[in-house]
Swiss-Prot record:
Residues 1-23 are annotated as: Disordered. One of its GO terms (biological process) is determination of adult lifespan. This is Zinc finger transcription factor pqm-1. It is found in: Chromosome; Nucleus; Cytoplasm.
Length: 295
């Protein structure tokens, strides 16, 4: 009995330590295996396709999002989300690219722009705007509009008042109204010397032109008598304004003549009515009884 002699047999063979450590799979290897298995699972099984009738398969466009590598899918999804958030801003910036250009960018409004703005703002027919020799626009002149005829050509801005015809800005309303009257309403003043094409907006420049170009001496004083109204004490600033003032007198005289004729006709009718004697009306007698008192 060998176990009594402490003989338990041959000792078990001891395993020698491994020479090399086993290689653990990395996360990239695991993701690659998952991607490969996903692709393999999507492949058709030949054993199941033997006894089946082939069906027509439509040619669908390749969708790259169905065959993504999981290692890069997260980054692509993040980029797609960022693009979806930025899409409204990009579209808004593209839509506003054409709105940056407008009439405010141009220092002067062209004739076509002025006609377009007038036709869009009002339902009336566009005014017949003409150009003079200096290229300034002449707006239609109508005395029936009254003293506020320049109001539709004046627009209030942050810096003052702007002429909508030539886009010039003045500090006061009276200044821009005078500008509209002189430069865009009254016709230009021409030089009366033969074969001279000089024109200007200011009457004083005509005298300077005649003195400098034609040697005509300047007048010693302003002849206010030629610009004085024969019907009242008014003195106009220019011959054109004097003609307008006299025309108003003629309109008033015509209205006064009409009113006088109406008054004469009314008084004649009243006199004819007074000459007619009123007809006598018969009054029936009213029977009266003496007062009676009953007790």
């Amino acid at each position: 009995m060998s176990f009594l002699n402490n003989d338990f047999g041959s000792p078990p063979a001891t395993s020698s330590p491994p020479t090399t450590m086993p290689k653990l799979p990395t996360i990239q290897d695991m993701l690659n295996n998952i991607g490969a298995s996903t692709v393999n699972l999507m492949q058709p099984n030949p054993y199941l396709m033997q006894n089946q009738i082939p069906l027509p398969v439509p040619n669908l466009p390749l969708n790259p999002f169905l065959h993504l590598n999981p290692a890069i899918s997260q980054e692509i999804i993040q980029q797609f989300i960022a693009m979806s958030f930025n899409t409204p801003n990009v579209l808004a910036s593209i839509a506003n690219m054409g709105d940056d250009e407008g009439p405010s960018c141009n220092p002067k409004m062209r004739r076509g722009d002025l006609l377009k703005s007038v036709s869009m703002d009002s339902t009336e027919d566009p005014p017949s705007i003409t150009l003079d020799n200096n290229g300034d626009m002449i707006v239609p002149n109508n005395d029936k509009e009254g003293w506020c005829r320049n109001k539709k050509y004046i627009e209030q801005t942050e810096n003052g008042y702007m002429c909508t015809v030539c886009r010039k800005v003045y500090g006061r309303y009276n200044s821009v109204s005078y500008h509209v009257t002189i430069y865009h309403r009254n016709p230009p003043i021409k030089c009366n010397v033969p074969n001279c094409q000089f024109t200007t907006r200011e009457a004083r420049y005509i005298h300077f032109h005649k003195n400098y170009r034609h040697g005509i001496p300047l007048p010693e004083s302003i002849d206010q008598g030629s610009r004085k109204c024969p019907h009242c004490r008014h003195v106009s600033k220019s011959p054109a304004m004097l003609e307008k003032h006299i025309r108003r007198h003629q309109i008033k005289d015509g209205l006064s003549n009409i009113n006088e004729a109406i008054r004469e006709r009314t008084s004649t009718i009243c006199d004819e009515a007074m000459e007619i004697e009123p007809a006598e009306t018969e009054v029936d007698p009213i029977e009266t009884k003496p007062r009676s008192c009953t007790l």
